Amino acid sequence: MHKVLLSIGTNTDTCFNMKRAIDNLHSCFPNIQFTSIIESAPCGAIFKGPFLNILAYFETNMVKEEIQGRFKSIEKIMGRQSSHKAEGIVIIDIDLIQWNNEVLKPEDFKRDYMNELIVQMQDIVGN
């Protein structure tokens, strides 16, 4: 089984979009577990804020590319467009940040809000 850690963020209609993302992810990955949702300031001048952020964890036999494809499908269903980033709009962003023991997005772990979410996730999964 592969261990999957992902981060989810939104700065647009935040409560609605976060709930939709959680529901969609739970439909795709029934054993998924989530931290609490926390608010953060935007990273970078282009993004509008505030953001809502959450971490999620699940185990699966799927390959990494299939999982990432499902994340992209959820983002597309929710209305994410490539032009939004340049406008500072993040309807939803679902990122695979750790695959088993491999950190895929080390810069994400440096964000201020991540420490709190990582501690929560360790309590949830017992690692």
Where is each model-derived feature located?
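Extreme N-terminal starter segment of soluble prokaryotic enzymes
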Residues: 1-5
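Short beta-strand-to-loop capping motifs
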Residues: 8-10, 56-62, 98-101
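Short N-terminal binding/cap micro-motifs at the start of the first secondary-structure element
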Residues: 13-17
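Flexible, gly/pro- and Lys/Arg-enriched active-site loops
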Residues: 43-51, 65-69, 73-127
